[in-house]
Amino acid sequence: MLEFLQQTTIPYQAIILALSGGVYAFEQYLNVRQLPHLKLKVPPPSIAPYLVTADGPKPEIKEKPADQGDEDTGEPASPQETFMKSQAYALDKVKFAMIAGFIDQIETWALLSPFAAVFFGSDPTKPASGIASLWALAIHLSHRWALVAPKLLKIGTGEIATSLFFVTLLSLTGMITSVPSSLYKTFVLEEKHGFNKQTLGLWISDYIKTTLLSALLGLPLIAVFLWTVRWAGEAFVQYVMMLLMGIVLFMYVGYPYLIAPLFNKFRHLSEFPEYQEVKTRTEALAKRINFPLGRLWVIDGSKRSAHSNAFFFGLPGFTKHIVLYDTLLKQSTPAEVEAVLAHELGHWKLNHTVMLLGSSQVQIALTLSTFRFFLWNGALFYSFGVPALGGGSEMGTRYPLIIGFLLAQSLFTPLNSLLSFTSNALSRTLEFQADQFAADLGGDYAKDLKWALVRISAENKATTSCDWLYSAFHHSHPTLPERLARLGIESDKNKKLK
């Protein structure tokens, strides 16, 4: 098997470009399937009942109709207006995704094909690619840096040092398209639909912080990762998995305390007199289900967006802390917030966090195990014009591991797309279970959760009209009609409408 895969006659470059194009075409096909659903002017019969507020508080979205922008009129939107708002928002997002996907695909082809290499003076008669040219530039920069850098900042000129320069160059080329795309999405698309709360100064500040954090944390981790793989050889999977698990556990604990405060302000819920009923209800709920509640935090999500959210964090077996977005508190009643938290804590009670972590680790382990067939495959590197590092090993000629992982990942892009269906299916199943957990608590939990979902969906202009295949690929959460139907609300709603 290995001997067959290492034949230089295998056109790996053409295969990967074809696979990349196939995945792109499939994703665009899904977008095209979704478009007719977003152009409906009247809610489909299966959705219409959920937009009629027969027995609960109506989601008050004080906005003009979809063709008049998002300024406050002082009047609550009708269910029809709410539906049209969500349709307009979803349609704009899909159109944006189609354009952004096309640009990303051009960037991918430029890196993987010989096209960009001609600008670096590559020999047109030999295999070449954009990544091979970037690697050659990274070698040059690492040697230049070794000559001019202060002693404390010298990192050598070996594979790891060159790989760090390569990753930096790759990130910089990505910024050419990602920065304009992010600016458009934030200040045009989100602004148009009333969600953006950021100023340009805040966006720039966030971008600088994110870039610096990525460099300060990401580059050392990449160095450790590459060293581990090179040190462990063919047995690298188990050691890399231990490294990744350590990173995941650190993020569980460190992100809320070390990273998130750089972007958002956390305040104790007790500091808000108007939300003391939420505090009382949450503490009672936690006590009822034996949730190890630590602190209740409020995060200033409204600083950047009108979207709402709630989550908890903490290592398995230890105290957990709950975080509520201020937008959720402003948009929902105390009973609805409690119902939302009952759903979130249901994930903890049903061990969903551990299940998702375990499934992701299994998926990563299987992927890395498959990568072993290609990390030292000279034919793969040759096809893209990537030279050997020189020297040898028991596995053969040494090639840049960072490029090996990049190319192996490109080979398995279709598989990753298929796994999106399975991972989303698992996630949606767990969401249904968490909804049912909240409903099974009795009392008004089912009704309050229903109206919380309706209100949050309306406030966030969530898509309620979806193509089934598009939804299966893109949505980790069930749609609003699906969740309400599973909660057993549909029959009750129909009775009240008669």
Annotate each language-model stretch with its function.
Residues 401-412:
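Short, contiguous hydrophobic alpha-helices characteristic of membrane insertion segments
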